[in-house]
Amino acid sequence: CTDIASAKALETELEWADAVVIGPGLSKSDNAKMLVETVLKTAEIPLVIDADALNIISDNMILLNEHKMPVIVTPHLGEMSRLMKKSIANIQEDIISVAGEFASLYNVICVLKDFRTIIAAADGEKFINLSGNCGMATAGSGDVLSGIVGGLLVQLRDTKKAAAYGAFIHGLAGDMVFDNTGSYGMIASDIIDGLDKVWIKVEKNGN
């Protein structure tokens, strides 16, 4: 996405999508910055913003005021530190309030990832996710979460439910495989493997 023509092409591609997950594997190149800016300004579908897209936004917070449609952000503590210009220690002192402040300030759903993930909505409602384990603090785990949330966003058409259910399902998938991997052996693909078990459990329960 390097010029007006490619930006227009991206806008056309967005027209067939029901939701967009942007950030994982993106980098902070000039092309990536233009892509993030184009998506935020033009997308007329819900967005899930993660990883490098958050890092790009942290250098220009005005971008987060550009969105037309519902947005879910999924920062870990380091990304939230850059977004809020606060130390990780300060965030951890009152993580629930920080998540709520960010959600309200930018009119987004904030999924702030920590040992207990906080989901905060702009209307003040908050959830604390109790599924998951320390083995999930592994490279790519957050990418899996953003993908789950994006998929649920399309199915449920509800940003709050997509964020809260997504965090719970992601954690539950990690719990499902913990006995086989332990806390040190778990990798992101193990969490994906655990999703099969989660969906089977959900279907058996009729939900």
Where do the PLM segments sit?
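Short, small-residue alpha-helix embedded
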Residues: 82, 138-169
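Short, charged, surface-exposed loops that flank catalytic or proteolytic processing sites
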Residues: 88-94, 156-164, 182-186
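Charged C-terminal helix
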Residues: 172-207
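N-terminal loops that bind phosphate or other acidic moieties
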Residues: 63, 124, 157, 181, ...
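Short pre-catalytic strand/loop immediately N-terminal to key active-site residues, enriched for Gly-Thr
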Residues: 128-140
